[in-house]
Amino acid sequence: MGQKVNPYGFRLGITTDHVSRWFSDSTKKGQRYSDYLAEDVKIRTLLKTSLDRAGVSRIEIERTRDRVRVDIHTARPGIVIGRRGAEAERIRADLEKLSGKQIQLNILEVKNPEADAQLVAQGIAEQLAARVAFRRAMRKGLQGAQRAGSKGVRIQVSGRLGGAEMSRSEFYREGRVPLHTLRANIDYGFYEAKTTFGRLGVKVWMYKGDITNKELARVQANVKPSRERNDRPRRGGRGSNAPEASTVPAAAGVEA
């Protein structure tokens, strides 16, 4: 299970949080859950396309009644802001045109790009697109992540490696990467490299330690207990061995 599932979704509410924060129960067109979800996808697609070289690690979206707040976590904030903020204004105008709402754009710098799995995956993909040998690019990313203080790193590259006819996958791993441990803080990143031989997929897992017992207890306290099935009365009918209760009151016995 832990080897296949996305580490973010697997640990949602334990070590990770939602990247879109809003609520909708309206049935009006333009305010439905599906409308907001489709709008989020369009916003992320637009930003990833226009900021392909800006080293975007994460995009967070938060909504109020008449405003959308977009937080862009990037390793190169100068590219996103542009000269005298011209690029940021252009991005804000494009987002307002797309959503039809007021956009609050926040640009946040990632202090340590080598400790961010998404940025490491993007860096390896850029090297592969520049015809760097895939093993060399993987080792370079592995060494940088270890220097940044990660307790364990796993990097996997899949596709027509080296221009081979048959696609395959290769990975390097250093340290521990416990994907089954829910309390393990696993950072995950994925990026595609576009080469002359086709696309290569790059995946990066980083293990940054476990959350403490106090933090785990606080998370578990916030989770509502599941509803027990035993508190409901059993229904009779087919498959039920319990005798049906008689609705006729029992007659009182009289001793002779």
UniProtKB/Swiss-Prot annotation:
Disulfide bonds: none annotated. InterPro entries: KH_dom (IPR004087), KH_dom-like_a/b (IPR015946), KH_dom_type_2 (IPR004044), KH_sf_prok-type (IPR009019), Ribosomal_S3_C_sf (IPR036419), Ribosomal_uS3_bac-typ (IPR005704), Ribosomal_uS3_C (IPR001351), Ribosomal_uS3_CS (IPR018280). CDD domains: KH-II_30S_S3. One of its GO terms (molecular function) is structural constituent of ribosome. GO terms for biological process: translation. Keywords: Ribonucleoprotein, Ribosomal protein, RNA-binding, rRNA-binding. Residues 43-111 form the KH type-2 domain. Residues 221-256 are annotated as: Disordered. Residues 225-234 have a biased composition (Basic and acidic residues). One of its GO terms (cellular component) is cytosolic small ribosomal subunit. Binds the lower part of the 30S subunit head. Binds mRNA in the 70S ribosome, positioning it for translation. Belongs to the universal ribosomal protein uS3 family. Part of the 30S ribosomal subunit. Forms a tight complex with proteins S10 and S14. This is Small ribosomal subunit protein uS3. It comes from Leifsonia xyli subsp. xyli (strain CTCB07). The gene is rpsC.
